[in-house]
Structure formats: structure tokens, C-alpha cells
Amino acid sequence: MKKLVSLILTVVLLTGIVPAFAEETPAHVLVVYFSHAGENYNVGVIEEGNTAKMGKIIAEQMNADIFELVPVVEYPMDYDSCLDVATEEQRTDARPEYVDEIENWDQYDTVFIGYPIWWGEIPNIVYTFMEAYDFTGKTVIPFNTHEGSGQARSQRDIEELLTGATVLKGLAVRGSKAQNDAEGTSADVANWLKQIGLPQ
């Protein structure tokens, strides 16, 4: 009997059945975000953007894949210059390009979309992303950082644009909190995910 078990194990190992069982299940949740480092309002000069920190917390709690919208042409690092560029993009309804594409888009059922609120608006580069992919049948969940404007009108704007998706209630966290209070932000995220009925 022991010889038979040993023989079966040898065959299993040689045929690669064990590695097949050991493969990780592909994630069905994706966190996509745009974030800006450098000089930020109310937090000074930072190495990692506020929304990036928030997005990574969400990805960790949801065991999700993560994709950062990295602009082809970088935004200025100083606040006033970045303000000028963003204002001009809003005025002209620009669609800034970003680096790379999302692989296996169809495997994701749930997509978190993160961004800072820039002068009352979603940054235009996020529109570039939202207009590039088919969200039909997906669940979309916005999240954002801000310094007093909350979600502004971003929830409504996303609902109006992504009509084929189910858009759940988003979460807005002050950028200063996301930047400096990881524990508090993690608690906010956990409570929010529970409220909108997502397992963690």
C-alpha cells in the first residue's frame, strides 16, 4: 500500500498536477488610481501621493490587483504650476495620455477608481481611462482624496459616464489624513467596505 501511494505521488509530481492546484486564483477586483506627488495643498512636498496611499490600503484589504495611471507627460511638481496645467486641461476638456494598459480587463468584475479632487473636478487623465474601457456589467466604486470638497460632484459624474456599470457609494478622505494617518484611513476604508457590502 505504501508503495502504491509513493507511486501515485511520483506520477502526480511528474505530470505537474500539484503546480496546477497551487496556482493562485486570478483577482477579480482591480484598484485603478491617479495620484500626484510633489507639492500638495495642505500636506507640503510628498514622495507618494495621497490617493496612492489610499488606493494601496484598499487593494490590501480587498486582495485586489492595482494599476496606477502614470501620465506620459508628468504634471509639474510644484503646486502653482500643476494648478495651471490642470486648469487648462479642464478648460479644454483634454484627455492626457497615460503609460501602459490594463491586461486581462475582462477578468475584473469590480473596479475601484481613485483620484484627488482637483479644483472641484476629477482630473482629466481619469476620464481618459474611463473612456478607454468597457465597464458594462462591472461594479465601479469611486474613492478620492480632498482637502474640504469631499466627493464634490465626482460620484454623479462617474454615474452619468459609466451608464453600463453599477456604481456604488464612494469614499472621500482628506488628503492630509491619507498621507499622515494610515491607521485611521485603514479604519475608514474597512468601515466603508462593510457599509457597501463588500467582503474583505
Please place each PLM-identified region on the residue numbering.
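Soluble non-cytosolic domains of exported or imported proteins
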Residues: 45-49, 120, 148-152, 179-183, ...
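Hydrophobic core
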Residues: 9-17, 197
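Second-shell loop/turn segments in exported
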Residues: 39-46, 113-116, 141-148, 175-179
